[in-house]
Regions:
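Cytochrome P450
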Residues: 1-141
Length: 141
C-alpha cells in the first residue's frame, strides 16, 4: 500500500492508528480457544459446560458489521483500535503496551532510514497454526 505508506511519512501523527490497522489486518495470534464453565448462549447457539469455543481473530477483525470495507487497509480508519487482536477485558494480553511500543519504534526507524523501502516480491508466511510469522519478505530500498 504505497499510498498509505506515503500518507504515514507525511503525517507521522497517524502512527498510532497505523499500528492498530496493521494489527487489525494481520493479527499476531490466529485463534484462541476457551472452554465454557456453565451453560451459555453465543450467537443463538446453546452450549453446555465444558464445550470448546474457538475465536478466529482474522474473522472478528474483519467483521463487516464492525469495520466498513473490512478488507481495505486504511490508516485513517476511525475504529481501527476496535480489533480483538490482543483479546478483551480480563483476557487482554499483558504484553499489549510493550508490543505497541516495539512496533512503533520499529516502524519509525525503518521509515526514517529507508523511506523508499518497498516489497520486491511475494512474502512467505511461516507454517504455523497459532501465530502469524513472516518467514520471508523480499524488499528493496
Amino acid at each position: 500500500n504505497p499510498d498509505q505508506k506515503q500518507k504515514l511519512i507525511e503525517n507521522p501523527e497517524l502512527m498510532p492508528n497505523f499500528l492498530q490497522e496493521c494489527i487489525r489486518m494481520v493479527s499476531p495470534v490466529i485463534h484462541m480457544r476457551r472452554t465454557t464453565t456453565c451453560e451459555t448462549e453465543l450467537g443463538g447457539q446453546l452450549m453446555g459446560p465444558g464445550e470448546k469455543i474457538v475465536m478466529w481473530y482474522g474473522a472478528a477483525n474483519r467483521d463487516p458489521s464492525v469495520f466498513t470495507n473490512p478488507d481495505k487497509f486504511d490508516i485513517e480508519r476511525e475504529n481501527a483500535d476496535k480489533h480483538l487482536a490482543f483479546g478483551i477485558g480480563r483476557h487482554t494480553c499483558v504484553g499489549k503496551p510493550v508490543a505497541l511500543m516495539q512496533l512503533e519504534e520499529s516502524y519509525k526507524q525503518i521509515l526514517s532510514r529507508f523511506p523508499n523501502i518497498h516489497m520486491s516480491g511475494n512474502w512467505k508466511v511461516a507454517p504455523n497454526n497459532f501465530v502469524h510469522a513472516i518467514q520471508e519478505m523480499p524488499v528493496k530500498f
